[in-house]
Amino acid sequence: DFRCPTTWSASKLYCYKPFKEKKTWIEAERFCAKQAENGHLVSIGSAAEADFLDLVIVVNFDKQRYRAWTGLTERNLKWTNGASVSYENLYEPYIRKCFVVQPWEGKSKWYKADCEEKNAFLCKFPKPH
């Protein structure tokens, strides 16, 4: 039975880790890819996964003031792991290209951000079977 590395948080199928170091979106995606096989910026496939990530975020970031890259870009609305968007949690007014999660009323919401901005980020990789 595969165990996530000690500093990573485990769900049934995936390992997750937030990084406070600030990077542009593409720098963060490249960094996540180096962390593990099939590593990417986080994709969020369901409300349950979003709730799990909120717990990971609260433990690792200042829950009032975080801003962290996800693997979603506006260009094709696909996650960096190739998955189509099956669940959305968007906050509308911002029109840019890449997406961050940041707090809104105690939960993480998705906001558009300039891909060149430097932000913290969340990595994810699937547990090998």
UniProtKB/Swiss-Prot annotation:
By what name is this protein known? Snaclec rhodocetin subunit beta
The family classification in the record reads:
Belongs to the snaclec family.
C-type lectin domain boundaries: 3-125
**Protein task:** Potent inhibitor of collagen-induced platelet aggregation. It acts by binding to the integrin alpha2A domain and blocks collagen binding to integrin alpha-2/beta-1 (ITGA2/ITGB1). The gamma/delta subunits mainly contribute to this activity.
**Where, per UniProt, does this protein localize?**
Secreted
Q: Which cysteines are joined by disulfide bonds?
A: C4-C15, C32-C123, C98-C115
**Coiled-coil region:** none
